[in-house]
Amino acid sequence: MSEEKAKSNTSRAIGIDLGTTFSCVAGYISGKVEVITNQDGERTTPSVVSFDENNCTVVGTAARNMVGSDPMSVIFDAKRMIGREFDDPKIQNAIKGWPFKVVRYNHREKREEPNKVSEGSNSYDNIAIKITRNGKTNYYAPVEISGKVLLYLKNAAEARLGGTVDSAVVTVPAYFEEPQKDVTKAAATIAGFDPNKVRLLAEPTAAAMAYGHIQTQKNANFSAKEDVLVFDLGGGTFDVSLLDFEFNGAAGSLGIVKAIDGDTFLGGQDFDNLLINYCISEFLKKNSSIKQSDLKESALLRLRAECTRVKAVLSSATSSAIYVPCFHMTDDLNVQITRARFELLCDHLFRRCMERTKGCLLRSAGVPEVEYSADGSKLLLNPSLEKTLNEVKNNISKVLLVGGSSRIPKIKALLAEYFGAHKVIEPVNADEAVAYGAAYQAASIYSDAVDAGSSLLLIDCVPLNLSIETAGGVATALIHCGDNIPIKKTETFTTYEDNQTAVTINVYEGNRAMCKDNKKIGSFNLDGIIAAPRGVPKIEVTFDVDHNGILIVTAQDKQTGKENQIKVTNSQNRLSQEEIERMTKEARDNEQRDNETKEKMGKRMAFDQAISSFKAFVEKANNISEEKKSESLRVIKENEEWLSNAQRPEDFEVEELERRSNDFQSFTSDIMKDVGMGGAPAA
C-alpha cells in the first residue's frame, strides 16, 4: 500500500473501551483496525489512577504499583462510581472493600457533607474520593478519574497517529443508566475530546461489530444470516446481547440488536472479592489472635493483586497458591486454592450470568415480562415459555466470548453445555474486542477511511416504552420496547378542555397502561395555544431517540407554529435495572387490570365527549323550546358534576358510568327527535 493510500485509509477517530479494571484503545490505521499500545508498551491499561508526592497524576501500571507505598492514594473502580449517588446500596457495599476514602461531596459548593446514608435520595454525582497527602486534602469526582484514564489513552493514540485526536467512540455497558452515560461523555470532554465528536456505544454491540468486521475481512463475498449472542463478562460489568446479522458480501452487512440484558455490578472484581474473603477467613482461622480489623490496607491491596493473578492462573492450571509475605506483621498468608474451590465460591455468580443470558433470549422473542429471583441468581420462568426459550437458543449460530472474565473455564463450560461447544468462540482477543469494534465504528462515523464494500451497520434498540400522558392518566406510547434506534415518531393530540391555551407534556418510561405505574422522566409546557373548543387545536408531539439513546421530545401547535421541547438526558428520574425488572413483573401481573383500566377510562372519555358535544348543540340551537333547553342544561350539569368527581379509575365503578352513559344517550336521542334531528349529536 502506498504512503498516500495508507494515509487516506487511516482515521484520526479512535475507539476506547473504558473498562472497570482494564481499558484499551484502538484505531483504524492503514485500512485495518490496530490496538494501540500505551506508553509502557502494553495493549491494555489498568484503569487505575494515583498521585505521587508532588500530587502529579499517575495512570495505569505505574499507579497500580504504588499500592505498596501509598495504598490510600491508589484509585480504581471509578466506572462503578460514575453517575451513581452516594446512597446507592451498591456503592455503600463497595465502600467496605475500597482502601481509598469515598465521601459524600457537594461538587457545586466544593464541600464534604456528612456520610450518613439517607432514604430515598436522588442526588447523582455526589461522590468524591478523598486523598490526603502531606497534610493537604484533595477531592476527586469519579468522572475526573475516568477522564484521566481517557486522557492517558488519548495521548497514546496521538503518539501513534502523529497528531491531535479529538473524535472517539467510547463504550459503555448496555445496561448503563442515563446518568452514567452522560457522565461518561463528560469524562471524554475532560480528557480533551470534542463533545460533539464523542459517540457512546454499548460494549456488546462494539464486540459484535468487531466480529462482523472480521467476518467480512476474511471473505469479502461472505453472505449469510446469523443469530449471534455476545457474552461480555468484564472486570466490573456483565452484558449479554442478541443480534441478527445479515452479511451481504460487497454490499455491506447489517446487524440488528434484538435484545439486551445484564448487570452493571457483576464481573471479575466480584470473583476477586470472594477469593479475598476466603483467604482472609483461612488466615484468621490459622491465626486466631489476629482480628480482621488488625489487617492493614496495604496488606489487603497486596492480597487483592495476588488473588487477581491466581484467578487468571486457574484458567489454565487446576490449582495454585495465594501467597502474601508478611501479610500481618511477620505472619505470611499462604492459601492453597484449587479450581474446583474457586468455582464453588463463585458458583452463584456464574449461575447469575447464565440466567441473565436466558433472560436475553426471552426478550429477543418479544417476551417483556422477564423476572428474576431477589438475588438475581434464578430466572423465574413461566413453564409455557420453556418451548420459546429452547427455540431461540437452538437458533443461535455463535456465542461470542468478550471480556477477560469470559476466559474462566467454568463460564465456557456452562455456555458450551447450554448452547453447544462448537458455537462458543473467541473471534478477537477477549480483552480487545470491544475497543476493536469501537475503533471501526469511529472510523466509519468520523472519517472516510473505511471502504464502502466492507461497511457494517449495527442498529441498537430501546428497552422500554416511551410515552406521554393523555386524558385520564393513560400512557400513550410513541416509541415501543424493542424499537430500533435511532428512531423518530410523531403523533397528533388535542386539548380536552374548552378554551385551553396551554398543555403540559408529561413524558414517561415503562410498559404499563397507566402513567402512575410508569416512571416520569420529563415534563414541559406548550403555551400560546389559541383558545378554542376542546378537540379543535392540533398538537403534534415528536419523540426522537438518537444513536446515544438520548431522547428529545418536541410539541408544536400546528395553528400557531409555536413549539417547545425537552432533552431527556442526565435525569435523576431515569430507571435503574432493578426498577425495570420490578416494572416488567408488575406489567405481567397486572396486564388484565391495566387493560380493564384503559377501557374504563376510554368509556369515561367517550361519555365526557358526548356531554361536551350535546352542550355545544344545546347552547347554539334555535329550534329547541326553553323547557327542553332548561331540562337539557340540568342533565348536562348533573353529569358534568359527576364526571368532575370521577377523574381517576378508582373514583367510579364502570357499571355506574355505563348506566349514566346509556341514560344520557336516551335523553339526547329524545331531545334530537323533538327538534327533528333524528339522533344524538356526534361525539
From Swiss-Prot:
Please give the InterPro entries that the UniProt record associates with this protein.
ATPase_NBD, Heat_shock_70_CS, HSP70_C_sf, HSP70_peptide-bd_sf, Hsp_70_fam
- What cellular component GO annotations does this protein have? cytoplasm
Alphabetically ordered keywords of this record: ATP-binding, Chaperone, Cytoplasm, Nucleotide-binding, Stress response
Gene Ontology terms for molecular function: ATP binding; ATP-dependent protein folding chaperone
Report the subcellular localization: Cytoplasm
Its main localization is: cytoplasm
Q: Which PANTHER family match?
A: HEAT SHOCK PROTEIN 70KDA
The Swiss-Prot or TrEMBL record describes its family as follows:
Belongs to the heat shock protein 70 family.
Instruction: Specify the protein name.
Output: Heat shock protein homolog ECU03_0520
Q: Which organism is it from?
A: Encephalitozoon cuniculi (strain GB-M1)
